[in-house]
Amino acid sequence: MGGTKIKIGIVHQDTILASASIDSYSGEGLRPRLPLIKEIVDKLLERAEIPITSVSGLGISSPGIVDNHSKRILSVDKKFGDAPDINLEEWCLLTFGIPFFIENDARSALLGEWKYGNAKDADNVILMTLGTGIGSAAVTEGRLLRGKHFTAGIMGGHFVINYKGSLCNCGNKGCVETEASTWNITNIAKSEKSFTKSRLADFPVIDYELIFRLAGEGDAMAIHLRDQSLQAWSASAINLIHAYDPEILVLTGGIMASSAHIIPYIRKQVETHAWTPWGKVDIREGKFPATAALLGIAHVVNNG
């Protein structure tokens, strides 16, 4: 479940047999989307010719702080604000009659890359997602980090990189997610004095696809926003590296459609500024930018 889209899939091992994507309307809550989610699941099962009795379970990859033991969403950051009040396991059992599993979305994406993708079989990995928000997750010494209160590894989007920065949805100021993610980039752009001189002013909604495209065409404001965001993401990557001591950093998410610009920039900044006397962190693009979380939550369903 993302801030912009909800992806739904039927997965067998590391293969997605059928999938669909719907608008999340996350600001309106999760409960109104549950009937449509059921409808899509039923259609996908029919398309794949799989009876519900053959399904191992249903897994949800959710933003926010997730207790995978009690199978509850504990806290969310504006997206799907009603989710902590919903007993999703009960909904799953009543709706489908199959076991239910849940995990944080960034952890799910990391599981997908760690088990099947570009971090396969590594023992120390961090993943950073660049999308509607900024997410992170970590594998240390071969273990997926969750922590006593289920926040270990996933707070990368809320590392402070500008203590005088804008107020974040989490209540802090200057989080990397506030400084450089899709949900706030329109506000950032419109706050710039020279915004009206930019072609960006012709668009009611600004995203990174537009910013990178106009930057490539020489728009000064787009170049400024692109470079400012690259610096913010690099600072976040370095913070994650210093916090979790990985061998591999995987970058994924919708913004990675511009990976040809993002990967070289972050790699150079990490090599220049990260304190890693043992050597260089291997920075890789995710193998499954759109489906890693589906594969990861399927792994949770199949392995508990």
Please report, for each region that a protein language model flagged, where it lies by residue.
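Short glycine-rich, Thr/Ser-proximal phosphate-binding strand/loop in the N-terminal lobe
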Residues: 1-35, 39, 72-75, 144, ...
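Glycine-rich phosphate-binding loop and adjoining helix at the ATP-binding site
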Residues: 26-38, 53-58, 64-124, 261-272
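Phosphate/pyrophosphate-binding loops at sites that engage ATP/ADP/AMP, CoA/4′-phosphopantetheine
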Residues: 37-58, 99-100, 194-200, 237-249
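Glycine-rich phosphate-binding loop of actin/hexokinase-like ATP-binding domains
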Residues: 120-179
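Glycine-rich phosphate-binding loop plus the immediately following alpha-helix
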Residues: 6, 94, 102-106, 160-199
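A mobile "lid/hinge" subdomain adjacent to the ATP/sugar-phosphate binding pocket shared
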Residues: 16, 177-250
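Glycine-rich phosphate-binding/hydrolytic loop that grips phosphoryl groups
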Residues: 101-114, 256-304
